[in-house]
């Protein structure tokens, strides 16, 4: 009997890079993880690790009883003691729970944390979205400064850039403060009531519970109705408007492309004030690569003090899918092609010398013919093939083939000469 992976999941494995999806390639995972970890270090963030399952009530309290996560997507189970637990559908709630449980609010504020790990949502499988997906995220707790918002957006943008995502634009909105919502929500609710018969069932249910979330509807009829709805930007309090201006000025100062999107609300109930999405047109209609926002009441909601927070999450699968549209970096710097048995040991010595200088190299250990070795060099995604045979050994050089152009040239000077030719 044979077994297959569960629906909505995938494997990461060494294979034919040209045939694999980006998220199936361990080399791309490693590159993204290393780049993100280095950026977090440079921005002053410390790693936090929380369990992959928590009390289910934690996610109900944080994301909201009416959120799609709670109503449709959580993997919920009971342990032997009868406690209701859930596989984590997102990262923020667990990090905030840890912040409160361990008294991190007693430390010098803000506390800046990052995480990397699997999340679980029982949702319809589609390109770049899975029931188990891996998220890179960051949370900053203990500061309401708008420049913190700018830093968080800049960090997300930098991670995506380091992975090769291009043409990215930040969509930005502000969901206001208590004063803003006191003025805006009744107006929006009255508008929705007038169009109740034209809305999808989920949006009708949200009229009372959280009318702002109707802007998150994917139903075409509802979206058509909402094009005429009042927008929150017209109702922002002076304080909320000033916060938004400061964030915009910060993004402009850093040269980060953004647009105001007054219909952007995000899909979780805990968001307040700043919300944002990083979008890239290379993904088509489902163009969001990462997103986040402020949750200034969540810490208190989960039993802690009145402490503001902001964060983001970005799916590894979405990032790698978006990055594929850019010119990908080669997975391998050099593949050594040996034309005779006598060339194998010198090839190994050269490869080891290049590895010591930081280059990635491979040799043939499967006894392939020279033609088969060239095919393997092509499949591996190597930038160059380094050819060694009797002529090269007797002449004290190697033949370097550019795998993209097919151009060949002789390279002498031993390991140093080869390093200069490959690395520049």
Swiss-Prot record:
GO MF term list: ATP binding; histidine-tRNA ligase activity
Span list, region Disordered: 1-22
EC number, UniProt record: 6.1.1.21
Major subcellular site: cytoplasm
InterPro entries referenced in this protein's UniProt entry, alphabetically: aa-tRNA-synth_II, aa-tRNA-synth_II/BPL/LPL, Anticodon-bd, Anticodon-bd_dom_sf, His-tRNA-ligase, HisRS-like_core, HisRS/HisZ, HisRS_anticodon
Superkingdom as given in the UniProt entry: Bacteria
GO cellular component terms, A-Z: cytoplasm
UniProt subunit comment: Homodimer.
Protein name: Histidine--tRNA ligase
Species name: Rubrobacter xylanophilus (strain DSM 9941 / JCM 11954 / NBRC 16129 / PRD-1)
């Amino acid at each position: 009997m044979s077994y297959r992976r569960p629906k909505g999941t995938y494997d990461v494995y060494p294979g034919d890079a040209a045939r694999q999806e980006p998220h199936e390639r361990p080399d791309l995972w490693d590159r993204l993880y290393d780049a993100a970890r280095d950026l977090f270090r440079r921005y002053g963030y410390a790693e936090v690790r929380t369990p992959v399952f928590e009390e289910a009530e934690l996610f109900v309290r944080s994301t909201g009883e009416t959120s799609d996560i709670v109503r449709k997507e959580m993997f919920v189970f009971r342990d032997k003691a009868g406690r209701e637990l859930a596989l984590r559908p997102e990262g923020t709630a667990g990090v905030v729970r840890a912040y409160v449980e361990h008294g991190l609010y007693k430390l010098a504020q803000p506390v800046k944390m990052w995480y990397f790990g699997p999340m679980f949502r029982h949702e319809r499988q589609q390109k770049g979205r899975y029931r188990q997906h891996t998220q890179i995220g960051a949370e900053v707790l203990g500061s309401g400064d708008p420049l913190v918002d700018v830093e968080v957006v800049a960090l997300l943008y930098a991670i995506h850039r380091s992975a090769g995502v291009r043409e990215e634009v930040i969509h930005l909105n502000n969901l206001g403060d208590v004063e803003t919502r006191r003025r805006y929500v009744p107006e929006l609710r009255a508008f929705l009531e007038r169009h109740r018969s034209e809305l999808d069932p989920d949006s009708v249910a949200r009229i009372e519970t959280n009318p702002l979330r109707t802007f998150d509807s994917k139903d075409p009829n509802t979206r058509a109705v909402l094009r005429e709805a009042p927008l929150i930007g017209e109702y922002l309090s002076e304080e909320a408007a000033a916060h938004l201006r400061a964030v915009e000025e910060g993004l402009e100062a850093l040269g980060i492309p953004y647009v105001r999107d007054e219909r952007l609300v995000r899909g979780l109930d805990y968001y307040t004030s700043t919300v944002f999405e990083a979008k890239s047109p290379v993904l088509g209609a489902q163009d969001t690569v990462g997103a986040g926002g402020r949750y200034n009441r969540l810490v208190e909601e989960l039993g802690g003090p009145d402490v503001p927070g902001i964060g983001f999450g970005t799916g590894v699968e979405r990032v790698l899918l978006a990055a594929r549209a850019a010119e990908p970096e080669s997975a391998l710097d050099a593949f050594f092609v040996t034309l005779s048995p006598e060339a194998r040991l010198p090839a190994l010595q050269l490869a080891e010398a290049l590895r010591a200088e930081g280059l990635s190299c491979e040799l043939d250990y499967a006894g392939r013919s020279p033609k088969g070795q060239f095919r393997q060099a092509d499949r591996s995604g190597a930038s160059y093939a380094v050819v060694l045979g009797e002529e090269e050994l007797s002449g004290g050089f190697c033949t370097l083939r550019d795998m993209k152009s097919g151009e060949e040239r002789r390279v002498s000077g031993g390991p140093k000469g080869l390093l200069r030719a490959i690395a520049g």
